[in-house]
Regions:
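Interhelical loop/hinge segments that connect adjacent transmembrane helices in multipass membrane
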Residues: 1-19, 93-109, 113, 248-251, ...
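Membrane-interface helix-loop junctions in multi-pass transport and translocation proteins
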Residues: 8-11, 134-137, 216, 224-259, ...
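Membrane-interface helix-capping segments at transmembrane helix termini in multi-pass transporters
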Residues: 11, 121-124, 129-145, 161-192, ...
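Transmembrane helical elements of multi-pass membrane transporters/channels
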Residues: 17-36, 191, 225, 254-258, ...
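Helix-terminus/linker motif at the lipid-water interface of multi-pass membrane proteins
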Residues: 27-49, 170-179, 235-241, 293, ...
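Small-residue-rich hydrophobic transmembrane alpha-helices
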Residues: 48-156, 202-218, 320-378, 382-384, ...
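Short runs within selected transmembrane alpha-helices of multi-pass transporters and secretion channels
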Residues: 74, 191-210, 218-226, 247-260, ...
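Alpha-helical transmembrane segments of multi-pass membrane proteins
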Residues: 164, 177-205, 283, 327-331, ...
Length: 493
């Protein structure tokens, strides 16, 4: 099958159609942020540092809610949309003959991880069949409505939390009360937090569109918002002389524009008002969302601890580590595009019990992930030694970066596989395993980080991070290789 990894058959076209726009959308925001940074840098170094701290704080708080919300929404919407499209006329006819038929069919359409979870999914999908009569009408997708409500609530909670606690939170981030960074940092964080509801709402809608296997609409909306942000930045900052406040206002406007575009497009396809409150899927979202929240905390703690350990080794090591880490993480955005496509296609295939497509899709995205990782390793191996000078001209920092480059380059195939395995497991709605396995991986990795960094300093940190990513990839491989959980069907293949 490896010879056909790049073949543009039906699965290959589906993967490309979803993965490429998803990867472009994921890279659009970092590019816009770089433009933001360039404009803010024109004001002064204090303002640049202040905004950097505020953005780091905002992103850290947002990440806790964003990842579980988007991942859960993508899988659930894909499942419900697929089931809603499965011969609606036949389902309606059969339901007139006997009400028990719907229950038995819906049970068969759900991958059974365990009896309790299967019963829960079967019960929720009965209500979906009741409201999913699609006759040239907008679709009824309960998980889409649920995601938007949860996203809006989380956005308002985040805004209130960041605005009311801006000063103490910035103090916690290292900006003291007498620091010249405090006032601009507080101004920027307070204003940017007004856009939190739009950020969470737009990402919830991106999850819905991903569930529909549509990543082009989020791409167009994101590009429109980012272009607006780039245009408004110099106008508000320099013409209106609002400084860092102008940058924050421009960003907030762009986020609300993205939300409006996505909401407009979504309302054309989906009836967002459910027939009644009981059709919403809050319980399912909260259960699986909390599992992924636990996973996000484990991942964040490992990366944050590694940065903290590098900082303890001095400014030179920390500067070199930040350059290596940013390159290491940025390349993962391309693998995330594959993960998104794998998740959406697999969730749909599992809902239809099309195990042949499940096997073919999982195999293809993993092969593409490995190929992507090898390509990134070659590109970074050839270019990073020279490209490092774009980040710094300090000789000592460049020397330490050269020590980290072999790890950054060598782990690219492992990283790509780890991220794609995440998408594969999410597509199988295997959220519990993903969460618990990541906690175990984090515990082992934290021990390695503490021991190796104390013994081998900078190299030790990167050896530990290599172990961390290897364990993440191994956990994904183990689940499929042992044919357990949603992959039990492989035993009969």
């Amino acid at each position: 099958m490896s010879r056909h990894v790049l073949k543009l058959d039906e699965i290959g076209r589906d993967i490309a159609r979803i993965a490429l726009p998803a990867a472009l959308a994921l890279t659009a925001d970092p590019i816009a942020s770089m433009m933001d940074t360039a404009f803010i840098g024109q004001i002064g170094p204090v303002e640049l540092a202040a905004v950097g701290v505020s953005i780091a704080l905002f992103n850290q708080v947002s990440r806790i809610a964003i990842f579980p919300l988007v991942s859960v929404t993508t899988s659930f919407v894909a499942e419900e949309d697929t089931i809603g499209k499965l011969s609606p006329e036949a389902q309606e006819s059969e339901s007139l003959e006997t009400g028990s038929h719907v229950n038995s069919e819906s049970k068969e359409l759900i991958p059974q991880n365990d009896p309790v979870e299967g019963a829960s999914k079967s019960k929720s999908l009965i209500s979906i069949f009741e409201v999913s009569k699609i006759e040239n009408e907008r679709r009824h997708i309960p998980s889409a409505s649920s995601a938007l409500v949860i996203g809006a609530i989380l956005g308002f909670v985040q805004a209130i939390f960041l605005i009311s606690g801006a000063k103490p939170l910035l103090n916690f981030m290292g900006v003291s009360s007498d620091s010249p960074m405090l006032i601009p940092a507080q101004q920027y964080l307070t204003l940017r937090s007004l856009g939190a509801p739009a950020v969470l709402l737009s990402l919830a809608m991106q999850g819905v569109f991903r569930g529909f296997k549509d990543t082009k609409t989020p791409l167009y909306a994101t590009v429109a918002g980012d272009i607006t942000n780039i245009i408004l930045d110099p106008i508000f900052m320099f013409i209106f002389r609002l400084g860092v406040s102008g940058a924050a206002i421009a960003h907030v406007i762009s986020q609300y524009l993205i939300s409006i575009i996505l909401l407009w497009r979504l309302m054309e396809q989906v009836d967002l008002l459910p027939p009644s409150f009981r059709h919403l899927q809050f319980g399912k979202f909260l259960k699986n969302g909390l599992l992924l929240l636990m996973r996000v905390i484990a991942v964040t703690f490992c990366v944050t601890l590694s940065a903290s350990l590098a900082a303890r080794q001095g400014a030179t090591s920390m500067a070199a580590f930040q350059v290596c880490l940013q390159v290491w993480l940025t390349t993962s955005l391309l693998a995330d595009g594959l993960a998104v496509s794998g998740q959406a296609i697999l969730a749909s295939a599992f809902a239809k019990k099309d195990y042949e497509k499940v096997t073919a899709t999982a195999s293809r995205v993993l092969q593409l992930g490995l190929l992507l990782g090898l390509m990134l390793a070659v590109i970074l191996g050839l270019g990073l030694s020279f490209g490092a000078r774009l980040f710094t001209s300090d000789v000592d920092v460049l020397h330490v970066i050269s020590i980290g480059i072999p790890f950054v380059v060598g782990t690219q195939p492992i990283n790509a596989l780890a991220f794609v395995f995440d998408g594969v497991n999410f597509g199988a709605s295997d959220f519990a395993y993903s969460a618990y396995s990541m906690v175990l991986v984090a515990i082992i990795s934290i021990i390695c980080l503490l021991f190796l960094s104390s013994s081998y300093k900078f190299i030790g940190i990167w050896v530990a991070l290599t172990i961390y990513m290897s364990l993440r990839a191994s956990a994904g491989f183990w689940r499929i290789g042992t044919r357990t959980g949603p992959w039990k069907f492989l035993r009969s293949c």
